[in-house]
């Protein structure tokens, strides 16, 4: 099966529809599928529920989909960098399901592994546990969390071969493997595509069995979320 598509728009064609549950990889602005997010915005699909570690920032990442009102609900761990998100949420225009970061990762991992639910202590005694099953194990209370099974996963990897085997780069790996494994359909944006067999086995972080479509974007912007620099240190003794 041919997995490589000539554009992000074509990679989404026939797969993404109104009202779907989507999962998007990344951590902050690191490791996000920029071209796929732009193509999703341009497709005009509406009423999306989006699973992601965060909601992007104003004008970039998932923030673009918030500006066009294509997201009706977010399932996320952190949303503090996006003023438009704040405005929509406080105006009751956007639904939000907060999920602790580790729990979110495990819900996605469980979905990809075929595990329907699991128990965790995280969130017990807080609003996170409201309406969920609680159970005692060895004198400790745990809350049951259900797996996440997105209709479509949008993923960013560094490199792929023609068969869809993926290699991630440094911290851009983050949530992407779990997001890829959980999706019923997985679409991946990469910076380089190589021939099948040219990658060493130990370079492959995720096997191509999880990947359905690939698009190459060799020059993503990779915007820095917050630039921090160290002040120049002067040697007062030698001055």
Model regions: which residues?
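Conserved alpha/beta enzyme-core scaffold
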Residues: 1-239
